[in-house]
Amino acid sequence: MKQYDYKTVSRTMLGDLHTPVSTYLKVRDIFPQSALMESSDYHGSENNRSFIALCPLASVSIDHGTAIFRLPDDSREEHPITDAYRVENALNDFRARFRVEGEYSNYCGLYGYTSFNAVRYFENIPVKDSREATNDAPDMLYILYKYLIVFNDFKNEML
């Protein structure tokens, strides 16, 4: 298993002139597969952050009973999800391939989603497995991004 090593480089900027949405609207057409994720926890403002993720390096998706790894060297691996090799094994195997060091490296993780249909991998609940040509999104998709813009609304700063 090949190990991918990365080191973070960060810069802090004053964030009171920019909003996550306005910044995302400026960069979304330049960087395909970009993502905007905003905090919805309004109880503790010290942890209220928004993220814009740009330029995917690698991804892991779970779909139709198969884990698919897309790695930084453009290789692709497929692993069937079974009782012996579960979703959590696939996610841990994928995550273990990456080592990120440096300031704010704790932000460099996997960003993505888990759809409702992913319940079939964790509980004994039947879910209709449909394949649609127009919208066949994976049940789970998590991406490691090259660039992150982190908005800390509590401190009015951008990383």
Residue ranges and their predicted role:
Residues 1-159:
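Signature of the chorismate-utilizing enzyme
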